[in-house]
């Protein structure tokens, strides 16, 4: 039996539907972040937990170009002369975990230059320095906001001297947006280790933990102590000025400050290390 194609689905109709589909928002990236059964020591080595955390491998500009959130105006590297190949300019693995009190963040990064000098320094201008920031919405909702209630950015400047602005918190609160302040000292612990593999003075390992109650709980009263199955919003922003001003950016799982574009971070139970088969 042959079914007739309705007139509204003939070429003009197909074009209309294709155009309509292109206007629909892309499905949010989903990542599953395991609970850590033992709290790691924050010392600039991820050895205790890197195999038990969320990570999805190495990111460089070529991989980012294939991602659904890629925007060349935002995801970019900069050319200041005598640059290495793009994959050597910046590539990184990022790690996340959680327990009843903390979110844990890690990064293992190959970078050709460590640059934490801002020509027009302000404490809040982490994005003009080498920095890795985790944008977290907790709990995730369906409202499009830019650093409104429930939105947080935990930003770690890659400076082992740990200046007062080295662990920065951009966040919202009920009725307020873009609040800027250091992460409360009692709520954060982090370490930066430069040149950990003896390869380049720009390489680094970042390890950090942020206590959730005085940060996420302050940003949104709807936050509650974490449970398996909770859904947060997430984006990673890695800034890389390389001696310039604003410089390069990697954006993962999102398209910028609008939390409606951020990925879904699902809290799960503990993970097991990757198993190697005997044959």
Question: What are the language-model segments listed below?
Answer:
Residues 1-9:
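N-terminal secretory signal peptides that target proteins for export/translocation
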Residues 6, 23-25:
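Glycine-centered signal
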Residues 11-22:
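Bacterial N-terminal signal peptides
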Residues 27-279:
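Structural preference for beta-rich elements and adjacent junctions enriched in aromatics
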